């Protein structure tokens, strides 16, 4: 069970599934939404995610995409698309070290002064689809 929430504690969540798609995204939308040079995300099935306290504010940042954040302190919490999955900001976890990133995505939009030096795979856009078996 993964648990986390916003800076002020008004909004809390739990994720009852193993995380996947652990990444650091460098796209302009994520950077702007979080106010940082990149943002670490992990994904869980939407059915395994629930809000435990508070109700986050929501903003449709692009067609089919809903970003949720604390209306009190502004902490960015989730990104929901149309795949039945929810991306959660890794650093909003109570223990963010428990879910390390596996790669960097959208590095074509990476800021020139944001140097990646961790040796993880880096993809200019999203990560490539798994090879067909």
Region locations from a protein language model:
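A short Gly-Trp-Pro
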Residues: 1-133
């Amino acid at each position: 069970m993964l648990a986390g929430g916003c800076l002020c504690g008004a909004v809390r969540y739990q994720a009852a599934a193993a995380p996947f798609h652990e990444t650091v995204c460098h796209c302009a939308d994520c950077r702007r939404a979080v106010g940082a040079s990149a943002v670490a995300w992990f994904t869980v099935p939407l059915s395994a995610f629930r809000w435990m306290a508070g109700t986050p504010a929501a903003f449709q940042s692009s067609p089919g995409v809903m970003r949720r954040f604390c209306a009190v302190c502004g902490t960015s919490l989730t990104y929901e698309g149309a795949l039945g999955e929810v991306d959660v900001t890794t650093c909003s976890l109570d223990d963010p070290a428990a879910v390390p990133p596996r790669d960097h995505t959208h590095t074509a939009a990476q800021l020139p002064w944001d140097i990646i030096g961790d040796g993880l795979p880096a993809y200019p856009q999203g990560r490539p689809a798994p090879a067909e078996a």
